[in-house]
Amino acid sequence: MSTRLLCWMALCLLGAELSEAEVAQSPRYKITEKSQAVAFWCDPISGHATLYWYRQILGQGPELLVQFQDESVVDDSQLPKDRFSAERLKGVDSTLKIQPAELGDSAMYLCASSL
């Protein structure tokens, strides 16, 4: 197989409808080549202290990758730490990075927040 296989990195916005508040996530869709770095960004609902990153592989339910309370990691037991990293600065926005991306990383990556 060619090493130039494309990995499909898709994500969708997961919003909460509280007086038009929503989680902002970008990019909405990401297609990349194998071995490239991928970064997703999430801006939670204002005032929400807890932030979650999920991965949903086609045909499966969502899997929690990491949970933050403000800047602190509460649970990252399912985060593949060899290539995945996540951070939340100042208890506000968060980034999820995959480097290098592999074909098996093809999934929806979802961000959510709560009080």
UniProtKB/Swiss-Prot annotation:
InterPro entries: Ig-like_dom, Ig-like_dom_sf, Ig-like_fold, Ig_V-set, TCR_beta_variable
GO terms for biological process, alphabetical: adaptive immune response; cell surface receptor signaling pathway
Pfam families: V-set
Protein species of origin: Homo sapiens (Human)
Keywords: Adaptive immunity, Cell membrane, Disulfide bond, Immunity, Immunoglobulin domain, Membrane, Receptor, Signal, T cell receptor
Disulfide feature: 42-111
Keyword Translocase listed: no
Protein name as catalogued: T cell receptor beta variable 11-1
Keyword Translocase among record annotations: no
Entry's Gene Ontology cellular component terms: plasma membrane; T cell receptor complex
Main function: V region of the variable domain of T cell receptor (TR) beta chain that participates in the antigen recognition. Alpha-beta T cell receptors are antigen specific receptors which are essential to the immune response and are present on the cell surface of T lymphocytes. Recognize peptide-major histocompatibility (MH) (pMH) complexes that are displayed by antigen presenting cells (APC), a prerequisite for efficient T cell adaptive immunity against pathogens.
Signal peptide feature range: 1-21
TM helices/strands, residue ranges: none
Subcellular location: Cell membrane
Record note on quaternary structure: Alpha-beta TR is a heterodimer composed of an alpha and beta chain; disulfide-linked. The alpha-beta TR is associated with the transmembrane signaling CD3 coreceptor proteins to form the TR-CD3 (TcR or TCR). The assembly of alpha-beta TR heterodimers with CD3 occurs in the endoplasmic reticulum where a single alpha-beta TR heterodimer associates with one CD3D-CD3E heterodimer, one CD3G-CD3E heterodimer and one CD247 homodimer forming a stable octameric structure. CD3D-CD3E and CD3G-CD3E heterodimers preferentially associate with TR alpha and TR beta chains, respectively.
Domain Ig-like: 22-115
